[in-house]
UniProtKB/Swiss-Prot annotation:
This is Cytochrome c oxidase subunit 2. Residues 1-14, 88-227 are mitochondrial intermembrane. Residues 46-59 are mitochondrial matrix. Mg(2+) binds at E198. Component of the cytochrome c oxidase, the last enzyme in the mitochondrial electron transport chain which drives oxidative phosphorylation. The respiratory chain contains 3 multisubunit complexes succinate dehydrogenase (complex II, CII), ubiquinol-cytochrome c oxidoreductase (cytochrome b-c1 complex, complex III, CIII) and cytochrome c oxidase (complex IV, CIV), that cooperate to transfer electrons derived from NADH and succinate to molecular oxygen, creating an electrochemical gradient over the inner membrane that drives transmembrane transport and the ATP synthase. Keywords: Copper, Electron transport, Magnesium, Membrane, Metal-binding, Mitochondrion, Mitochondrion inner membrane, Phosphoprotein, Respiratory chain, Translocase, Transmembrane, Transmembrane helix, Transport. GO terms for molecular function: copper ion binding; cytochrome-c oxidase activity. The chain crosses the membrane at residues 15-45, 60-87. Its cofactor is Cu cation.
Length: 227
């Protein structure tokens, strides 16, 4: 979960988020090395008294500063494309959940069940119980089984929304008239919070998302109680 004054990412709860964290560290290291080299060159230019006014061309240098950036871009692009294809790959999901964005709440439908639908509204601050999180708690949580492939179908009834859960590495636009899909696989149980990540009106900040990931046995008990 997130912590006050946190600067980094939330702990990864899915294989995709773990890959994204590794890619972030990989890219950040490349950026750090390039920035260090640029600062070193600038400081050397400011402190040295040597000049090369007679130099008209330098084929070796031009070759290096053409090939080296290309290699660096390839080192960034290859792992990025790998993760992109992983995020779009959906193989035999065990469960499908349809998510619809509204101004300003979410509705969910478990399409594998005959009549398992509900709306999810934010709990007002005045109604919170001790220990509950302000602006993040909802009246109906999305209960899902852990360690299973879940397909999320996401759309909107009115304006643009975005369904995002940072610790799972999920952020999918909810667009009216279009059905987007994403895959969710949680590696451990727990409560995972997200919010609408697309400005959608005056109450945009009051559209939280709460996923409750539980073992399959407890999910079956919950789904039976909801029918």
């Amino acid at each position: 979960m997130a912590y006050p004054f946190q600067l980094g990412f939330q702990d990864a709860t899915s294989p995709i988020m773990e890959e994204l964290l590794h890619f972030h560290d990989h890219t950040l290291m490349i950026v750090f090395l390039i920035s260090s080299l640029v600062l070193y060159i600038i400081s050397s230019m400011l402190t040295t008294k040597l000049t090369h006014t007679s130099t008209m061309d330098a084929q070796e240098v031009e070759t290096i500063w053409t090939i080296l950036p290309a290699i660096i871009l390839i080192l960034i692009a290859l792992p990025s494309l790998r993760i992109l294809y992983m995020m779009d790959e959906i193989n035999n999901p065990s469960l499908t959940v349809k998510t619809m964005g509204h101004q300003w709440y979410w509705s969910y439908e478990y399409t594998d069940y005959e009549d398992l639908t509900f709306d999810s509204y934010m709990i007002p601050t005045s109604d919170l119980k001790p220990g509950e999180l302000r602006l993040l708690e909802v009246d109906n949580r999305v209960v899902l089984p852990m360690e299973m492939t879940i397909r999320m179908l996401i759309s909107s009834e009115d304006v643009l929304h975005s369904w995002a859960v940072p610790s799972l590495g999920l952020k999918t636009d909810a667009i009216p008239g279009r059905l987007n899909q994403t895959t969710l696989v949680a590696s451990r149980p727990g409560l995972y919070y997200g919010q609408c990540s697309e400005i959608c009106g005056s109450n945009h900040s009051f559209m939280p998302i709460v996923l409750e990931l539980v073992p399959l046995k407890y999910f079956e008990e919950w789904s039976a109680s909801m029918l």
